[in-house]
């Protein structure tokens, strides 16, 4: 794999599983298609009718919950922060965890439904040490469905 000096720019699910601690049903990133360390990430999740959440949200009109869109954005931001510091390093990932600190300027614009490819477009707004602030949009077919600014910290995993 790549080093932190020359990080890879794409991650498939087998790579994501080695960096993020999330698992089904809370892993909300299927693939990273673009990653520029300390700058930006583009990732996505394919939304299918088989998502457990559609059993109750809503049975006759399935809509992917906005809070899960924001969580997917946060997971993408966590990947960006971690790989900006350590590149693709599964051993280091076992010792670190990214915690949400704040969520600001959230807007939901268009419902996300089964069959949509939900893209997360995030950029680093600022970071100092282990504190990272990212902002951006979630998009479907090039249309903004949500936007937010997120702050997180990278901590030691106990």
From Swiss-Prot:
The active site is at residue 57. It catalyses: a (3R)-hydroxyacyl-[ACP] = a (2E)-enoyl-[ACP] + H2O. Its EC number is 4.2.1.59. It is found in: Cytoplasm. Belongs to the thioester dehydratase family. FabZ subfamily. The keyword Glycoprotein does not apply. CDD domains: FabZ. It comes from Helicobacter acinonychis (strain Sheeba). GO terms for cellular component: cytoplasm; membrane. One of its GO terms (biological process) is lipid A biosynthetic process. Keywords: Cytoplasm, Lipid A biosynthesis, Lipid biosynthesis, Lipid metabolism, Lyase. This is 3-hydroxyacyl-[acyl-carrier-protein] dehydratase FabZ. InterPro entries: FabA_FabZ, FabZ, HotDog_dom_sf. Involved in unsaturated fatty acids biosynthesis. Catalyzes the dehydration of short chain beta-hydroxyacyl-ACPs and long chain saturated and unsaturated beta-hydroxyacyl-ACPs. PANTHER family: 3-HYDROXYACYL-[ACYL-CARRIER-PROTEIN] DEHYDRATASE (PTHR30272:SF1). HAMAP family: FabZ (MF_00406). SUPFAM superfamilies: Thioesterase/thiol ester dehydrase-isomerase (SSF54637). The keyword Cytoplasm applies. One of its GO terms (molecular function) is (3R)-hydroxyacyl-[acyl-carrier-protein] dehydratase activity.
């Amino acid at each position: 794999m790549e080093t932190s000096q020359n990080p890879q720019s794409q991650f498939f699910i087998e790579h994501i599983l080695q960096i993020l601690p999330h698992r089904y049903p809370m892993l909300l990133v299927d693939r990273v298609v673009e990653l520029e360390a300390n700058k930006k990430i583009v990732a996505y999740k394919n939304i299918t009718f088989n998502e457990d959440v559609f059993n109750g949200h809503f049975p006759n009109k399935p809509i992917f919950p906005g809070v899960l869109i924001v969580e997917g954005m946060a997971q993408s931001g966590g990947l960006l922060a971690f790989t900006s510091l350590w590149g693709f390093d599964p051993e280091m990932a076992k010792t670190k965890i990214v915690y949400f600190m704040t969520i600001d300027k959230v807007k939901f614009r268009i419902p996300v439904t089964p069959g949509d490819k939900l893209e997360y477009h995030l950029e680093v707004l600022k970071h100092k040490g282990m504190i990272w602030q990212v902002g951006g949009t979630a998009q479907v077919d090039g249309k903004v469905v949500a936007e937010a600014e997120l702050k997180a910290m990278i901590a030691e995993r106990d």
